Amino acid sequence: MRKSNLITVLIVVIIAIAGAVIYRTQFPAPAPEATLLPEGIGIAAAEAAVQALGNQGKVVLILPKRGNFKNPMVEVQQAAFAKTLARHKDLTLSATESIEVERPGTMGAGGMDPAEFQQLVQRHADATGFVSFADFPEFSKEALASLKGKKFIVVGGANPALKSLLTGGVVQAALVPRTKPAASNKKPGSAREWFSATHEVVTAANANSLP
């Protein structure tokens, strides 16, 4: 090999190594909980659906949408949910929908259009339950009445009326961040353990634990 060619090869190798170092510095590998926690949320949401629906029926999954932004963590939740639900043959995932959660000038659960959520539910009249990774909108009493007969599992606790929604039987289960530390101090390992360490499932039975 000519000396000039050897120098060129060495320069290319050095540039490649430098690029790899810069990439790892600027874009380090995510901490385990970065993917394990959303996976655990997806698993726990499916388990809550099975519990609430009696292991049978049709489920519609509702994902949050923020314009054109694609959140990879939501994709992890979705995949874990679908995989866990698929183990229960009599409970099927009949549809997956997305709903805008950040209308201009709003934030949190208030950023979702209640009318859009209501229309989504009406489009799936044959569904037994709905699992919303987009939280639950703030409905009027009249609008809530139109949701009777359906069961809802909600991921998120931004709705200030969540406690009354649970005790009133509108929402069957909510997956929310823990208000008190988990009983175990052991560092979580699996995705499900990460969920249990940081979140909890709230139903009508323990809704008083909510603030």
Where are each of the predicted segments found?
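A residue-level marker of the well-folded mature domains of exported/periplasmic proteins
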Residues: 2-211
